Amino acid sequence: MAQKIIRVGDIEIANDKPMVLFGGMNVLESRDMAMQVCEEYVKVTEKLGIPYVFKASFDKANRSSVTSYRGPGLEEGMRIFQDIKQAFGVPIITDVHEPDQAAVVAEVCDIIQLPAFLSRQTDLVVAMAKTNAVINIKKAQFLAPQEMKHILNKCVEAGNDQLILCERGSSFGYNNLVVDMLGFGIMKQFEYPVFFDVTHSLQMPGGRSDSAGGRRAQVTDLAKAGMSQSLAGLFLEAHPDPDNAKCDGPCALRLDKLEPFLAQLKALDELVKSFPTVETA
């Protein structure tokens, strides 16, 4: 099965290429913290030889509470992203929530992300596709892996085949998510790169009444399980002080654990991709 290669600058993204990291923080809390987080990611990924794209959100539009922190907003967010690109020379990925944001974000960011909750919103999908930017499509918690084909088709029909799929867990009763490991293989059959968002797969949606809970202690176990499926890359959020993060702290890796965490996953990725394919169909 031929695997499609997506190129972002000098980075090649494909299921049979070395793992790529989409990593950063959940939401832009401040310019200084974004710089601190990106600097650590750049240092670690350069040391380990992992291709890297910085991730953060300028707006968290689906918070559980109307009083929860959402981010600096579109204009300030784009200024911070431009500062990060200038300082570190890394590509940027961020999410888009409304059709009229797509073109503005695509002017600054190298990859634009379709949020899981919004992945069936045709107007948003088409607006994002028409930017011709690379799109990271999050699989909704309520969709089966095979249903991602419909979202891919919407993008292609709008003229964009620069697409990535991303698993982020499936609803498992109330306030819980589970990752179906068989789903990775189903999505890989579409031949587009598949990523694993381990951070949000650890969520317990609404688990703290007015915000999501999480299972940070299990991040290494779940990341290893996902990356054993020979994927294009990992989606990860880290924070210098997760217990005081403004969003999704219970799911975030401690920033000072980034190097040992990624070292294990890189070794696993190399091992898995060294194996010959065994046809069992």
From Swiss-Prot:
Protein's cellular compartments: Cytoplasm
Coarse class of the protein's main subcellular location: cytoplasm
* Annotated pathway: Carbohydrate biosynthesis; 3-deoxy-D-manno-octulosonate biosynthesis; 3-deoxy-D-manno-octulosonate from D-ribulose 5-phosphate: step 2/3; Bacterial outer membrane biogenesis; lipopolysaccharide biosynthesis
Q: Reaction catalysed? A: D-arabinose 5-phosphate + phosphoenolpyruvate + H2O = 3-deoxy-alpha-D-manno-2-octulosonate-8-phosphate + phosphate
Pfam families in the record: DAHP_synth_1
**Would you kindly state one Gene Ontology biological process term found in this protein's UniProt entry?**
keto-3-deoxy-D-manno-octulosonic acid biosynthetic process
Question: Which Gene Ontology CC terms are recorded?
Answer: cytoplasm
Asked if the record carries the keyword Cytoplasm, the reply is: yes
The organism's superkingdom is given as Bacteria
Q: Which family does it belong to?
A: Belongs to the KdsA family.
Q: What is this protein called?
A: 2-dehydro-3-deoxyphosphooctonate aldolase
Species assigned in the record: Pseudomonas fluorescens (strain Pf0-1)
